[in-house]
Structures are given as C-alpha cells and as structure tokens.
C-alpha cells in the first residue's frame, strides 16, 4: 500500500496575511432575530420599568450635556 500524505501547512500563513488578519467587527446592537418573542416582550417591559436603568440613562444624559 502507498503511504498516505500527511497534512501540509505550506503557504497558508502568507495567504492569510496577504490581506491582513482582521478582527470581527463589533456591532452596536446584537441581533434579536430568532429570539423567543415572549422573552423580548418581557425584556422590553423590564427595561422600561427598572429604576436602576433609568438612573444610569439619566446620568449619561447629564454627563453628555456638560
């Protein structure tokens, strides 16, 4: 039987670096596509009625004005 070829890594590094290895771009908002609608409704209402979140948003507005 003929020997099977072992894997080779030749030229792979230069190919990947030719256009640069880039980090994946961070998106501002994570997609909610495919997420349970009941969870999304509950999340929206929780954010709306949570006083700690409102405090942090008000602080951000004050800091941005100054």
From Swiss-Prot:
Its main location: cytoplasm. Residues 1-66 are annotated as: Disordered. The gene is RPL29. GO terms for cellular component: cytosolic large ribosomal subunit. It is found in: Cytoplasm. It comes from Tetrahymena thermophila. Residues 47-66 have a biased composition (Basic and acidic residues). Belongs to the eukaryotic ribosomal protein eL29 family. InterPro entries: Ribosomal_eL29 (IPR002673). GO terms for molecular function: structural constituent of ribosome. It comes from the Eukaryota. Keywords: Cytoplasm, Ribonucleoprotein, Ribosomal protein. Residues 1-14 have a biased composition (Polar residues). GO terms for biological process: cytoplasmic translation. This is Large ribosomal subunit protein eL29. Residues 15-31 have a biased composition (Basic residues).
């Amino acid at each position: 039987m003929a020997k099977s070829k072992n894997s080779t890594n030749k030229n792979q590094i230069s190919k990947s670096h030719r256009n640069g290895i880039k980090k994946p771009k961070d998106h501002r908002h994570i997609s909610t596509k495919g997420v349970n609608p009941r969870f999304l409704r509950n999340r929206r209402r929780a954010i709306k009625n949570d006083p700690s979140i409102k405090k942090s948003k008000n602080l951000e507005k004050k800091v941005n004005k100054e």
